[in-house]
Each structure stands twice: as structure tokens, then as C-alpha cells.
Amino acid sequence: MVTIGNAHNDLIHDAVLDYYGKRLATCSSDKSINIFDIDGTESYKLVSTLTGHDGPVWQVSWAHPKFGSILASCSFDGKALIWKEQPETQQWSIIAEHSVHQASVNSVSWAPHELGAVLLCASSDGKVSVVDFNDDGTTSHVVFDAHAIGANSASWAPLSSTPSPNQKDAASLKQQRRFVTCGSDNLAKIWKYDAANNTYVEEARLEGHTDWVRDVAWSPSMLVRTYIATASQDRTVLIWTQDKAGKWQKQLLTEDKFPDVCWRCSWSLSGNILAVSGGDNKVSLWKENLQGKWESAGEVVQ
């Protein structure tokens, strides 16, 4: 396990490996983003520090490598910034600024790469925005109301299957856009693209928490069924699955409440292990057994 000490001068809010697992991006209340080269399991090197935000940086998200070396970040300053590394110089620069929100942008997430360079943002102004970065260098965005008191996180659904040749045109792919958001209204909501009105409409409402939902994560792979995890201020994590009739069913990850607030939840790439971090300074790992119950798979003490 690689442990990076003194990575920032203030609280670290996110740490994300790139597609190949070779580079780590971290962000902090010190308003900066650090890029580390990770070599194996023991060594690392700080290669870049990115500054451009005017407030704490909450989250970072790597784009798929087919778009180049691109990173999105979001901040309390109400902006999402898009950074690109020039391969010749290995220098990073801001190539786009998304500033449509009126409050802190709490979450940024790139869509599955088959859908194009599309960024999803969730903000404390209660709105969610979806930004398309078009091939001709232009951008277009859709902004809509999602959670009345504030949107805290958002996560894309995986594509249900590999599109057939006649589904690969832009219009058909756009129809497959789905994501889940969560907010300070104690809810998570699933949204789908509405082509007729060029916006996103609520497909399902996931009710089960009794306090703010801090994070939501849609399992990245389609196994026997699809999973959504929600982590809440109420010290519980819920696992949501869709039954044959299309209705979403909830299950407590564990019958006992967590010792403190559940801040974040994250699926493994294969979608079969869930990591949960909370106010108790621990990261716990969970997996589903053959009986459909979730059981502990270990923990990492910070």
C-alpha cells in the first residue's frame, strides 16, 4: 500500500487513480490539485501542482484516455475546471471553465466514454448540469433543478450493453444517458435524457434515508443486476437494486449503524466490492455473499 504523507497543506477531499492506475490526482481545502506518479506499490513522485480554484477543491475526475490526459475538478468557488496535460511538455493548463452554478460545485463525473466527452456536475444551488464537449471545440450544457436544498453527488449509470452498429449514432447514444444524484433533501434520484425537450427527467426516486445523502455510486459494471449505493449523514449505507418490474428495492448494507456519518462510497472496477468511508476515519470494504447479504471484506484504518 502506498502512503503519501504531507500531500497537501490542508484537508484532502478526494484521491483518484487514472485509468491505468499509474497516476493519482488529489485535491484539498488548500485550493490545489496534486498529480503523483505511482510506481508499483511503494514509491510515488509529485509531478504537478495545479492551481486555479478560489476555494476548497472537493472532487477530481479523470477522463477516459481516448480523450487525452484530461482531469476535471470542482470547488466551493462554484466552478468546474477542465485541465489538460500537453504530452510534449507534461505541463497542465486549464482548457475550459464551467461556471453556470450559483454555489459550491460538489461533484464532477465523466460519462462512460462511449457517450463522448460529457461531464456531470452537482451543486449546492440544488441544480445539476451536464456539459457536452463537442469535437469542434464548442461546448453545450443543460442545467436543471434536482434537489431543493442542494445536490451533493452524482454518478453515471453504466451502458446496459455494447451498442449495436445502428445504435452508435449520437442521437441513439444520447438516449442511453442515465445517472443518479443525491442531495440534502434525504433523497437520491435517477434521471434519464428527454430528447424532445433536451433536458433530463426524473425516472425514479430513491427514498430511505433520514438525513442528508452525502454520496451516491452506481456500480460500474452490469453483473447479474445493477447496484446503486447511497451513503448518508444518518450513519447508514443503502444498496439499491432493480426488480423485474423495474421498481428499485433497498437493502441496508449492515443492520448496525456506522459509528459516524458515512461520507463516501465507491465501487471496485468489477463492481463486486464496495468501499465506504466515514467520520470514524476508517474505510470499510463490503461484498455480497451467495445469499444476497452484504458482509465485511476488511477495513483500512487511517
Swiss-Prot record:
Domain of life where this protein originates: Eukaryota
Protein topology in the membrane: Peripheral membrane protein
Predominant location category: membrane
Keyword Transferase: no
Transmembrane regions: none
WD repeat feature ranges: 7-46, 52-93, 100-141, 162-201, 208-250, 257-296
Gene Ontology biological-process annotations: COPII-coated vesicle budding; ERAD pathway; mRNA transport; nuclear pore localization; positive regulation of DNA-templated transcription; positive regulation of ER to Golgi vesicle-mediated transport; positive regulation of protein exit from endoplasmic reticulum; positive regulation of TORC1 signaling
PROSITE patterns attached to this UniProt entry: WD_REPEATS_2 (PS50082), WD_REPEATS_REGION (PS50294)
Sample GO molecular function, one term: structural molecule activity
Alphabetized UniProt keyword annotations: Cytoplasmic vesicle, Endoplasmic reticulum, ER-Golgi transport, Membrane, mRNA transport, Nuclear pore complex, Nucleus, Protein transport, Repeat, Translocation, Transport, WD repeat
Reported function: Component of the coat protein complex II (COPII) which promotes the formation of transport vesicles from the endoplasmic reticulum (ER). The coat has two main functions, the physical deformation of the endoplasmic reticulum membrane into vesicles and the selection of cargo molecules. It also functions as a component of the nuclear pore complex (NPC). NPC components, collectively referred to as nucleoporins (NUPs), can play the role of both NPC structural components and of docking or interaction partners for transiently associated nuclear transport factors.
Protein name as it appears in the record: Protein transport protein SEC13
Source organism of the structure: Scheffersomyces stipitis (strain ATCC 58785 / CBS 6054 / NBRC 10063 / NRRL Y-11545)
Gene: SEC13
